[in-house]
C-alpha cells in the first residue's frame, strides 16, 4: 500500500506543473485583458463557471479558469463562482446567478 501511495504521489508531482497556467501564460492573459469595459454594467453580475470534464480532461481548463478570474477581477463586470460540482444546477441554485459559463466541459449533455 505504501508503494502505491509513493507512486501516486510521484506521478502527481510530475503532473503538477501542467495543472496550472505558467507565470508566462498568466502574464499574457493579464496583458490581453481590457482594463475596463466599454459599457459600464448597471449592476455586478453573478456568474457560475462550471469546469467539469467527464471524459477527456482538457489541459486548457485551468488556463480558462484563470482567464475568467482575471477578467472578473480587472473589469469588475461579474463576480465569479467556480465549480466542478452540479449542486448549483437546481432551480433554486441557478436563481442566484445571472449567467453560466461552461469552461471546456465534456460529456455533460445527458446531465442537462
Where in this protein do the model-derived segments appear?
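Bacterial N-terminal signal peptides
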Residues: 5-15
Amino acid at each position: 500500500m505504501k508503494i502505491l501511495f509513493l507512486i501516486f504521489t510521484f506521478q502527481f508531482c510530475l503532473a503538477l506543473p501542467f495543472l496550472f497556467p505558467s507565470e508566462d501564460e498568466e502574464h499574457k492573459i493579464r496583458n490581453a485583458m481590457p482594463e475596463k469595459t466599454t459599457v459600464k454594467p448597471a449592476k455586478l453580475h453573478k456568474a457560475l463557471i462550471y469546469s467539469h470534464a467527464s471524459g477527456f480532461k482538457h489541459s486548457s481548463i485551468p488556463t480558462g479558469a484563470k482567464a475568467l478570474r482575471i477578467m472578473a477581477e480587472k473589469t469588475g463586470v461579474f463576480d465569479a463562482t467556480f465549480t466542478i460540482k452540479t449542486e448549483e444546477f437546481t432551480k433554486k441554485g441557478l436563481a442566484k446567478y445571472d449567467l453560466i459559463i461552461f469552461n471546456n466541459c465534456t460529456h455533460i449533455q445527458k446531465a442537462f
